[in-house]
Amino acid sequence: MFDIGVGELTLIAVVALVVLGPERLPKAARFAGLWVRRARMQWDSVKQELERELEAEELKRSLQDVQASLREAEDQLRNKQQQVEQGARALHDDVSRDIDIRSSATPVATPLELAHADLSASAHVDAAAGAAAGAGPAPAPAAPVIAQAQPIAPAPHQTLVPAPHDTIVPAPHAAHLTSAPAPPVTVAPVDAGTSASPTPSEPTKIQEKQP
């Protein structure tokens, strides 16, 4: 504590032995030891108090730092809250302006006007009902006529009936005609200068044998 070395202690002991003598030296040593203990105890207590104070100061500094950070956070939160409130107020003002503009553009009907409108509507309805009752039942709307294509019936199958076979009755001279052969017909050459009229030929046997 006092930074006293071994040589210094021996020097102090020799001086005390010479001054006090051998009889008083033990008592003086005990007294000096007690004072040294007390001084050390005091020093230790002071040292501990100093350390405690230093720790308390450090804690205070740390608390101050924390408080400063908390204050900064509070300031930031307040600024944000103010910004949000300003935005909400601006939005509220815009909405109120729009509502005022719309309300001024479209006037609100009073209760008297609403009652008058209801009465007029009921009067119109009664008048229309009376007119409909006096005119009689309204004719039913004509149903739209839709021309439907009728299916074409197939034509009846026509059966061709063969005509009766005509029986040809031979004439009495038919046998003679078939049995007698016809003579050959001779054609004379016709000149260019002469007329093209045919010359009468001799009557055939068929013509002679006519009845």
From Swiss-Prot:
Its main location: membrane. Gene3D superfamilies: 1.20.5.3310. The keyword Transmembrane applies. Pfam families: TatA_B_E. GO terms for biological process: protein transport by the Tat complex. One of its GO terms (cellular component) is TAT protein transport complex. One of its GO terms (molecular function) is protein transmembrane transporter activity. Residues 194-204 have a biased composition (Polar residues). Residues 175-211 are annotated as: Disordered. Coiled coil: none annotated. It is found in: Cell inner membrane. InterPro entries: TatA/B/E (IPR003369), TatB (IPR018448). It is a single-pass membrane protein. Keywords: Cell inner membrane, Cell membrane, Membrane, Protein transport, Translocation, Transmembrane, Transmembrane helix, Transport. The chain crosses the membrane at residues 1-21. Disulfide bonds: none annotated. Part of the twin-arginine translocation (Tat) system that transports large folded proteins containing a characteristic twin-arginine motif in their signal peptide across membranes. Together with TatC, TatB is part of a receptor directly interacting with Tat signal peptides. TatB may form an oligomeric binding site that transiently accommodates folded Tat precursor proteins before their translocation. HAMAP family: TatB. PANTHER family: SEC-INDEPENDENT PROTEIN TRANSLOCASE PROTEIN TATA, CHLOROPLASTIC. The Tat system comprises two distinct complexes: a TatABC complex, containing multiple copies of TatA, TatB and TatC subunits, and a separate TatA complex, containing only TatA subunits. Substrates initially bind to the TatABC complex, which probably triggers association of the separate TatA complex to form the active translocon. Belongs to the TatB family. This is Sec-independent protein translocase protein TatB. It comes from Xanthomonas oryzae pv. oryzae (strain MAFF 311018). The lineage of its organism: Bacteria, Pseudomonadati, Pseudomonadota, Gammaproteobacteria, Lysobacterales.
